[in-house]
Amino acid sequence: NAGTFYSSMMNVDIRIEGGNPNASAIRAHFAQHCSISNVTIHVGKGRAGIVDAGNHLENIAIYGGEYGIDTDKSAPGWPIMLLNSYFEGQRKSAILTNEGGLTIVRMRAKNVPVAVEIKENAPDRLFMEDCIFENVHRTGVILTDAGNAATQINLRNIQCKNVPMFALERFTNQQIPGKEKTYRVTRFTFGFNADSLEDTPQIVRRTETEPIKSITPLDTGDTPMLPATEQWINIRNLGAKGDGFSDDTHIFQEAVQKYANIYIPQGWYVVKEPLTLKQNTNLIGLHPGTTILLSLGGNPAFSGFGAPQAQLTTPQGGKNIVCGIFLNADAYNYRAVNCKWMAGEGSYMYDVKFSGHDKARFFHNGQSAANPLEKPMSITPETHDLITRAWDNQHWSLWITNGGGGSFRDIWTANEYSSAGLYISHTDTPGRIYGMSLEHHLRNEAIFRNVANWKIYDFQFEVEAEGIDTQPLDLIDCKNLTFANFYSYRVSRMLKSYPSAIRTWNCKDIEFLNVHNYAHARVKFTSNASLYDVNTHREARRWELARLSLTGKESRKYPLSQEKGKAELVVTGFEFIDGLAQDSRGNIYFCEHRMRRIYKLDARSGQVTSIADFPWNAVALACDTQDNLIVVTKYISQPGYNNDDTRNGNRPLFGWKGSGGLWGFNYVPKLYAIRPDNPDESFQVLPLVDMKQFAAPQQIYYPGNRTITQSEY
């Protein structure tokens, strides 16, 4: 039921009294991005605490019952994130799963016959990390369907006390015995495994166990509790309206300067200028579907041609908590980034939605549909034939950069108007993602560039029909990353397949634990390969993998001879490369016009890297005397603005029909310059100036390789 999006139950205690042997406390078969948190259930003589678990469960404790959780697939077949849980006294098993796709972090199961049981005749994808089994008298885990390619089991750092048998294979009756009274299973892998991209995947069962003296308590410090409510200040009490019309910008800015914990009730809060938090600022929203921070379409602070500009920014090294809000940059705000996150390892973002997906609730020209129950506006960015020029006009929704890290839980970033749902760049600060869904983007769902020391649990990609050419995950110059329960899904409306779910460039020490690359049952168009490495031409063809390791030591599939004068294939897979340019060190740059990407071929290493991904169509490239990269773009002025990015009051802020064609858009050349080693932070618009200001230019560039129209240069 699509109406159950963002349903939630939290801060509740439930008790089933005697005489209810078939009773279960909660049936949690929600649609998407729903949660149960801070809930304690006493099942007693009843059947189960939770049946048909939803997408996210956190801080739950279940006592008694036949089962603590009894679940099938969540809707719509996503993985299930179970974080910080406690089970005790179940009569059959703490958890019973049938293709649940559970990702379990920090679970403690005590005084039960079985901790986790996979149902008979069913493959499953199970990942567990940092868990405790105590007094589990039959077996820790019951496995099944050993020969099925979809069986993917990975268990890491499972501490056991009084668990004589760690695992049992149901049909073969093979047993994995425990060691000593107290021991730790450091690694357990069961299913198709590839130790590198050069390996042919084979079904394995690997166990690494070591004795320990005692159980170490579970550390939940990376998901801190909110401050006490007595310490909160209600933004409404400071004068904020939240009506979708009034300008609440300065009230928010003043609140950040004065208060540490700002509570935001439901409402549509118009924020017209960037909001930057202090080191200790916490933003606490009531609900991510109804507590909206909105920048109206055509907002000058986020409009026009230029460097990324964030609605919300956290400071470097901050310990911020941001939760329960919806960041919405409307449809037309070319420079917009919803959130630029630079807070440190101790920071925390959870239960946050990023704009998009709800096409009927947008704003323009002072009009709004502030109440979701109001009739949708007659003017939207979408045309009658569902072709939208607004799509892919903004920067990334969530941008984690400049040493940003911390924990991110239960995030939904589904926005056709942004160039990617998640962009992580230039950070080796440890980070963790506990459940994130990325959907509906046109070119990229997620990009990691120069990132290290992150763990990503429950990464869910839903590539929609508008994203027929979308790369789900791009990893560029990354190392020491772990992905657990990686789901890449292409919907039934797809008309063709896509080359890869994961694309890598110059990466090493990347581990995928449980890879599920699939399409809807009604179609066969999924991603051809689960992973493709650009520079080695190596790929993981299998769609279902228990474990896949990218070591970074893989050799090229087709070695280069280094013979002078011989043409050889270096890299492939581009749509239409253009704009070749060379810097003083021999590095070569090129671009893809439609896909809006810029690449570098390093003269020393011979490796190709994706270096930039901005929402403008690059036409030609050049290098100046200081090796800055100059980019010529085909720029379409933002609706409501002139070509020079000044406001045009005679034009609406959404699409219009005019003499320039169906949409009345005119193409004009715009130029910017970047440093290739960090384009995002060095983006500089190059203004049009009078040549008389430069009597003796050092270098003159004529972009003769390709033009937009005959008269534009």
What role is predicted for each listed range?
Residues 556-713:
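Sequence-structural signature of mature extracellular/luminal beta-sheet repeat domains
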